[in-house]
Amino acid sequence: MKFLSALLLIVLLISVVFGNTSGPSSAWATTTTGGTTGSQTSPATHGGHGGNGGNGHSNIDIHADVGLLDTLSVHARVKANVADTVNVKAKARVEA
């Protein structure tokens, strides 16, 4: 569980750093968590995606999968586009 907590903290930090801060209608991108754990008969569902930036150009799309089989594995893919000029992609994988 502490691996998932650490991963969520990293995701939130990236959201703050790459949130939309330009334009008169600037707003932080929002993220949602959730999804279900998969099993051999039912696949895991995905967590929510980040919200769009206030000016319509910046957005952060956060995608995290958590699967429990023999080990705990957390997969997160973060993609940020800031003002159509900066493209940032980060991947993290933690296994217990």
UniProtKB/Swiss-Prot annotation:
Q: Does the keyword Signal apply?
A: yes
Span list, region Disordered: 27-58
UniProt lists compositionally biased (Gly residues) regions at: 47-56
Glycosylated residues in this chain: N20
- Please give the GO cellular component terms listed in this UniProt entry: extracellular region
User: Keyword set for this entry?
Assistant: Glycoprotein, Secreted, Signal
What ranges does the record list as Low complexity composition bias? 27-46
Q: Where is the signal peptide?
A: 1-19
Subcellular localization is given as: Secreted
Q: What is this protein called?
A: Uncharacterized protein DDB_G0282307
What is the protein's species of origin?
A: Dictyostelium discoideum (Social amoeba)
